[in-house]
Amino acid sequence: MKRQRAFTIIELLVVLAIIAVLIGLLFPAIGAVKRNARQTENNTLVRGVLQSMVTYSAGHRNFFPGFDGFAFDDNTADTTGASAHGQTPEGRYWVMLTENYTTGDALISPSEDKTPWQRDAVIKDNYSFAMLNLATNPTVVTPPINDGNAYRREEWRNQQNPQVPLVTDRLVDNSEYIDGDTTTYLSIHDGSEVGKWLGSIGFGDLSVEFSNTSEVETRFSGYRNDADDIFTPGDGTGTGQEPFKNAEITYSVVNQPNG
């Protein structure tokens, strides 16, 4: 009968070293899987917001919540403050929530810890996603060529434009944030670092992509921008690590017809 040989210390150390290497390889892979799952879920939520907007538009002359083609919806003023109306994301989300086009849970990214809306006013803590910046009421007359707001308002309706971002992740400020300076940008997602924005971008045709840049090609109202920073000029004021900064998307208008 052969006597069984026990592991030597050296052999045991070799086995432990192999296990450590395998763990070192496995953990990043697990992290990547989790990160990809969150990104996929985030894309799904952004697409859900777009689909809710399209459903709303079917009964409102193809316009999305908050703007009817002539003026902003002021029915939201009772709950969001007189300055809000339908021009802010809060006002537009309020319309969608109170008229049951979406739910509070559907507005919060898996990468954020926020409070789902229950009742009354919609506040910054109730949503994760930016909406197209419609700015001031169009009753304030501005020559169209100088009014980027007019071009964006023209796109706030269901016309299946695949190059018009309508709903995206927000731009989050950091303590060194400089308005409109992409080198200071930050986002809520894992892998983001100062100067590297990551996030879901939802377009007018209901397509959604998870992008590692805030610069995309846009075509809207007869104009094209091949590298349009959707957060320029910046939409937030001041600095500081506030999780609701830049909750509106802004296009840069360039005198470059579609081609």
Can you describe what each PLM-predicted range is?
Residues 2-44:
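Amphipathic alpha-helical segments typified by the pilin-like N-terminal helix
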Residues 42-259:
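Short, well-structured segments within or immediately adjacent to enzyme catalytic domains
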